[in-house]
Amino acid sequence: MTATKQHKKVILVGDGAVGSSYAFALVTQNIAQELGIIDIFKEKTQGDAEDLSHALAFTSPKKIYAAEYSDCHDADLVVLTAGAPQKPGETRLDLVEKNLRINKEVVTQIVASGFNGIFLVAANPVDVLTYSTWKFSGFPKERVIGSGTSLDSARFRQALADKIGVDARSVHAYIMGEHGDSEFAVWSHANVAGVKLEQWLQDNRDIDEQGLIDLFVSVRDAAYSIINKKGATFYGIAVALARITKAILDDENAVLPLSVFQEGQYEGVEDCYIGQPAIVGAYGVVRPVNIPLNDAELQKMQASAKQLKDIIDEAFAKEEFASVAKN
């Protein structure tokens, strides 16, 4: 796409709880002028397209329809939420092999359509599937993006905001690493309206050190808590995806925590996709924002990346995946 293009087209692949919530977010936030929805359950996509179209009189004009893979050919953005859902007691990394097979089939068909836009991946394990989308598509790394730690960082900011009594939009803090159990909080750069969190807490005494540890654990494990209560998470990630979509379609050059390709931005972290802040616009990732990590944070980044890299290497050692890799 070009930064000045007026008609912006999104194709969503995967019309489950996350996908349909994302589609709803696009409609209510007036994002994009065209939305095609693909799923193996065709009647579901037809029903959702019809249902969503009934909201347009309250929002803004938009073409919404049940799409085919051939419709991807002129899309600006393809959003991948298709995959087996995470079950109670299951980690995101437990999903690897079955969702790699789904990812391979989906990406192959999208590329065959002539698609030349940007991939945004949200299916879990998102860092692994963003990497596999890059491998299977042959696309430049800048045009394959994962939702990464966007939701985790939002949860982190909201949790801190609730504790200290400010608007979450005034809290600037990131979760980095895997979107999953090995993620970590970048405490060294967390701030409230420009005041370092450490200084803020000294001045206001809103929470002690153990409270901060407990807060991070609640953020890291939030998905498990929600899955145990209602079976799946979808509203938060849907709005996170809508935010990323807007940044891309409107060429915002926004800084967002995403799953982006690693080629030595951090010592010992290479050839994987992992969560870190990045500038994103109409052409995908403009460049990663390499927050200087302290020694403890760097070790956590390296450990998180190693866990992902080991899984990637094991998966792509298998002929069924290695044989179709283009990158």
From Swiss-Prot:
EC category = oxidoreductase
Tell me which InterPro entries the record gives.
Answer: L-lactate/malate_DH (IPR001557), L-lactate_DH (IPR011304), L-lactate_DH_AS (IPR018177), Lactate/malate_DH_C (IPR022383), Lactate/malate_DH_N (IPR001236), Lactate_DH/Glyco_Ohase_4_C (IPR015955), NAD(P)-bd_dom_sf (IPR036291)
Residues the record lists as Phosphotyrosine modifications = 224
> Which pathway or pathways does this protein act in?
Fermentation; pyruvate fermentation to lactate; (S)-lactate from pyruvate: step 1/1
**Which parts of the sequence bind beta-D-fructose 1,6-bisphosphate?**
157, 172
Query: Reaction(s) catalyzed by this protein?
Result: (S)-lactate + NAD(+) = pyruvate + NADH + H(+)
Q: What is the active site of this protein?
A: 179 (proton acceptor)
Does the keyword Oxidoreductase belong to this entry? Answer: yes
List positions binding substrate: 86, 92, 124-127, 152-155, 233
Recorded hits in PANTHER family, A to Z, give: L-2-HYDROXYCARBOXYLATE DEHYDROGENASE (NAD(P)(+)), L-LACTATE DEHYDROGENASE
Q: What is this protein's function?
A: Catalyzes the conversion of lactate to pyruvate.
Subunit structure, briefly? Homotetramer.
HAMAP family named among the record's database cross-references: Lactate_dehydrog (MF_00488)
In Swiss-Prot or TrEMBL terms, this protein is called L-lactate dehydrogenase
Lineage at the top is: Bacteria, Bacillati, Bacillota, Bacilli, Lactobacillales
The gene name reads: ldh
